[in-house]
C-alpha cells in the first residue's frame, strides 16, 4: 500500500486540494507510517499562547495580538528495535490535529494535520529535552479575497502547508504521565501556489501533557548492536528532479510550472548523517511568462535566460531509517540569469523517503517534498523524486 502511494509523482498546488494537497498528505503519512516499528504509544495534549510576527512591511494582516491554539495527538516512541533508533537517541514519530485561533484580523482560524518527528537532545533523571519538527496540511478559514477579505494579505488560499519547529523540556511525574513546556515557531503558507502569499509566522510558548498507554522504562531501550561509524562508503552522489506550481504578479491568475533539478556529492559522516555540496538549477516558467507579457524581456531568448536560476548549496541530511530530513542553504550565482529573485540566498527544508536498494547495489530511489524560502517568505513547495548512489 505504501509503495503504491509513494510511486505516484507529487505536484503541490494547495489551491487544488483534491489533486495535490491530498497527495502531499498521503506522502507525509506514508513516510511516517513506514518508520513505526515501535510499540510504546503516548497520547499528547498541548496548548499554545503566542502572537503573529510582522515579518514583512507589506503585510496588512493583523499582527502582534495575543493568540492561542490547541493540539491533540499521539506519538510512537522507538526503543532500539533497529540500530538507527539507538544511534538517534530513540526518537518518536507522531501525528497531531491542531487548531490556531489567528484572529478576525488575521484570516480567522487555522486547522492542521501535522505529522512530526521528536528528537531527544538529552535526558537526566526525570528530565528530558526534545526538538520537534513537523510539516503537514492546514486549512485556513478566511484567506484573502478581493471582494470579501481584501485587507488580509498573508494567505491567499484555504489549503496551506504547516511547518513547525518546537523545542521543549519534559518532566516525568509517574511511569504513565509526563508534563512538558517550551517554545515554537509555526509557519502557514501555500508556497506561492495562490497569491498573496506572505505567510503567517506564529511564535508561541506552549505547555502540554502526555499519557503513556504502557510505561516506558529504562530497560525498554535496546542498545545498538553495531556502530554508527562503520560506513561502507564515505563518498557518493545524488540527483533529483522536482516540480512546483506558482502564481505570479496577478491574484487569481494562471499557475506556472517551476522545474527543478539538482545534483550533489555527499560525504557520509556516519550511518545517520551526511554533508551535501551541489548545485540547483531551476526553469521558472512564471518569471518567463510574466517577463514576456510585461515587456521586461524583449524576446524569448532573454526570457529563457532571465527565468533560469542557478545556485550552489550546502546541506546536511539526517537519516532516520528510510526517512530523512535535509536542511539546505543556497546562494544564486551567474551573470544575466537569476533575474527577479527576492534575495541573493535561500533556504530549503526537505523530507525524503528512501525505497529499498536497487538490484543489490548501493543505489536507492527516493521521493519527497521541499519548501523553499527567502528569509521568512516561502517561494514554493515542490514534489521531488531522485536517486542516491
Predicted regions and their residues:
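Short loop/turn motifs that connect adjacent beta-strands in outer-membrane beta-barrel proteins
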Residues: 39-40, 79-90, 122-128, 173-177, ...
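Outer-membrane beta-barrel translocator/channel fold
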Residues: 41-60, 81-87, 107, 124-171, ...
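Membrane-embedded beta-strand positions of outer-membrane beta-barrel proteins
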Residues: 43-47, 93-95, 131-135, 167, ...
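Transmembrane beta-strands of outer-membrane beta-barrel pores
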Residues: 47-53, 76-78, 97-103, 135-141, ...
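Extracellular loop and loop/strand-boundary signature of outer-membrane beta-barrel proteins
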Residues: 57-60, 100-103, 149-155, 190-197, ...
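Residues that define the transmembrane beta-barrel architecture of outer-membrane proteins
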Residues: 64-70, 89, 107-113, 127, ...
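Outer-membrane beta-barrel "beta-signal"
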Residues: 72, 201-222, 349-351, 378-389
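Gram-negative (and chloroplast) outer-membrane scaffold detector with strong preference
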Residues: 90-141, 209, 267-269, 273-337, ...
Amino acid at each position: 500500500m505504501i509503495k503504491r502511494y509513494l510511486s505516484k509523482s507529487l505536484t503541490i498546488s494547495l489551491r487544488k486540494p483534491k489533486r495535490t494537497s491530498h497527495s502531499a498528505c498521503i506522502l507525509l503519512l506514508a513516510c511516517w507510517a513506514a518508520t513505526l516499528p515501535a510499540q510504546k504509544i503516548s497520547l499528547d495534549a498541548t496548548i499554545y499562547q503566542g502572537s503573529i510576527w510582522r515579518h514583512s512591511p507589506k503585510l496588512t494582516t493583523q499582527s502582534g495580538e495575543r493568540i492561542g491554539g490547541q493540539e491533540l495527538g499521539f506519538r510512537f516512541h522507538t526503543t532500539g528495535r533497529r540500530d538507527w533508533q539507538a544511534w538517534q537517541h530513540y526518537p518518536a514519530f507522531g501525528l497531531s490535529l491542531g487548531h490556531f485561533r489567528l484572529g478576525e484580523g488575521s484570516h480567522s482560524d487555522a486547522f492542521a494535520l501535522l505529522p512530526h518527528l521528536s528528537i531527544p537532545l538529552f535526558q537526566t533523571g526525570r528530565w528530558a529535552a526534545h526538538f520537534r519538527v513537523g510539516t503537514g496540511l492546514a486549512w485556513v478559514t478566511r484567506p484573502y479575497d478581493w471582494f470579501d477579505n481584501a485587507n488580509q494579505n498573508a494567505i491567499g488560499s484555504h489549503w496551506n502547508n504547516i511547518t513547525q519547529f518546537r523545542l521543549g523540556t519534559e518532566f516525568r511525574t509517574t511511569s504513565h504521565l509526563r508534563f512538558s513546556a517550551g517554545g515554537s515557531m509555526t509557519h502557514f503558507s501555500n508556497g506561492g501556489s495562490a497569491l498573496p502569499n506572505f505567510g503567517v509566522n506564529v511564535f508561541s510558548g506552549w505547555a502540554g501533557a502526555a499519557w503513556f498507554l504502557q510505561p516506558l522504562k529504562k530497560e525498554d531501550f535496546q542498545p545498538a548492536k553495531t556502530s554508527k561509524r562503520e560506513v561502507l562508503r564515505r563518498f557518493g552522489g545524488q540527483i533529483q528532479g522536482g516540480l512546483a506550481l506558482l502564481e505570479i504578479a496577478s491574484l487569481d491568475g494562471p499557475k506556472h510550472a517551476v522545474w527543478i533539478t539538482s545534483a550533489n556529492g555527499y560525504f557520509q559522516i556516519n550511518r545517520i548523517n551526511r554533508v551535501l555540496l551541489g548545485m540547483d538549477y531551476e526553469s521558472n516558467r512564471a518569471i518567463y511568462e510574466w517577463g514576456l507579457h510585461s515587456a521586461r524581456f524583449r524576446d524569448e531568448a532573454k526570457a529563457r535566460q532571465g527565468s533560469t536560476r542557478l545556485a550552489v548549496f550546502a546541506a546536511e541530511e539526517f537519516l532516520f531509517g528510510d526517512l530523512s530530513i535535509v536542511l539546505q542553504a543556497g546562494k544564486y550565482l551567474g551573470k544575466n540569469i537569476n533575474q527577479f529573485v527576492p534575495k541573493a540566498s535561500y533556504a530549503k527544508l526537505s523530507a525524503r523517503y528512501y525505497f529499498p536498494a536497487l538490484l543489490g547495489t548501493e543505489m536507492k530511489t527516493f521521493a519527497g517534498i521541499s519548501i523553499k524560502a527567502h528569509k521568512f517568505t516561502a517561494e514554493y513547495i515542490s514534489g521531488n523524486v531522485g536517486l542516491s548512489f
